[in-house]
Amino acid sequence: MKTIAVLTSGGDAPGMNAAIRAVVRTGLDKGLKVMGIQRGYSGLINGEIFEMHRYSVADIIHRGGTILRTARCEEFKTEAGRKKGVNILKAFGIDGVVVIGGDGSFQGAQLLSKLGVKTIGIPGTIDNDLAYTDYTIGFDTATNTVLDAINKLRDTSSSHERVSIVEVMGRGCGDLALFAGIGGGAESVIVPEKEFNEDELCKTILEGKLRGKLHNLIILAEGVGGGEALTKKVQETTGIQTRLTTLGHLQRGGSPSAFDRILASRLGVKAVELLLEGKSSRVVGLRNNKVVDDDIDEALSMKSKFDDELYDIAKILSY
């Protein structure tokens, strides 16, 4: 193992830069040549590859986004596209690749490994939807971003005595809604993992109004869908002014939290160590505050780890 490369793929997440920094500096410390691949798999098959040095990753640990950029790549989904990427890696003398991203990015790494490329995956996604790891890079920061928005919405909701429905990211995983809901003291958390009844929700809102509540904050994971319809239903049923706020890509930005910076640093170091050990088709993660690594096929096939106990806590504390 003489030369490794690092790329970021899929949706960006705060802390990706910290992971890049850890990979680059660990690789250099171990005597490796480290290359950066720009714009994910798209950059790979287009040869957008450059050598990285210690100064290449100076002053980036605090920055959101990814200095390597990221992109989707339809061509890489084809066998011809992947073979083109492998040939480019060979042309640059690259022996192993560290892929930072979510499940789609890991599937790409999995396909590369089947073509003989040593690959290690680092989980970078605000959705926290990879079951093999307790936390993904970017999730903690995104939770705090949502929390900040909730705090502000609480102020104006109280002033106008209205219901605020806040739609957050999370197509198949409700962790972001759940954690932000508990942290923000939301009256209701609606996630794809749990069924909910609109009529019961409206009844609870009216009961709160009778007790003198000035506002209601409802956190809705985007995977549930129907935010506008729910907003209309609540207002028509309760007679209380109801507003929908969709936070969107705001949740992906911002300076990463201390937790995400440290997590990214730990996982970046581990990824390089695994390559030096000759390992491939592995992903790194965190379980019980211990850095772990798993086979990429097993990691992708693990079922969702939704925390039912935490969801029950959210319901107990909500009203």
Curated annotation (Swiss-Prot):
EC number(s) reported in the record: 2.7.1.11
Assembly with partners or alone: Homotetramer.
Cofactor (UniProt): Mg(2+)
Classification via Gene3D superfamilies: 3.40.50.450, Phosphofructokinase domain
Subcellular localization: Cytoplasm
Ligand binding (ATP): G11, R72, C73, G102, D103, G104, S105
Gene: pfkA
Protein activity control: Allosterically activated by ADP and other diphosphonucleosides, and allosterically inhibited by phosphoenolpyruvate.
Positions of substrate binding: T125, I126, D127, R162, M169, G170, R171, E222, R243, H249, L250, Q251, R252
GO cellular component annotations of the record: 6-phosphofructokinase complex
Record organism: Clostridium novyi (strain NT)
UniProt xrefs under SUPFAM superfamilies: Phosphofructokinase (SSF53784)
Protein residues bound to ADP: R21, A22, V23, V24, R25, R154, G185, A186, E187, R211, K213, L214, H215
Residues forming the catalytic site: D127 (proton acceptor)
Cross-referenced InterPro entries: ATP_PFK, ATP_PFK_prok-type, PFKA_ATP_prok, Phosphofructokinase_CS, Phosphofructokinase_dom, PKF_sf
Official protein name in the record: ATP-dependent 6-phosphofructokinase
GO molecular function: 6-phosphofructokinase activity; AMP binding; ATP binding; fructose-6-phosphate binding; identical protein binding; metal ion binding; monosaccharide binding
Pathway given in the UniProt record: Carbohydrate degradation; glycolysis; D-glyceraldehyde 3-phosphate and glycerone phosphate from D-glucose: step 3/4
UniProt keyword terms in alphabetical order: Allosteric enzyme, ATP-binding, Cytoplasm, Glycolysis, Kinase, Magnesium, Metal-binding, Nucleotide-binding, Transferase
Residues annotated for Mg(2+) binding in this entry: D103
Functional description taken from the UniProt entry: Catalyzes the phosphorylation of D-fructose 6-phosphate to fructose 1,6-bisphosphate by ATP, the first committing step of glycolysis.
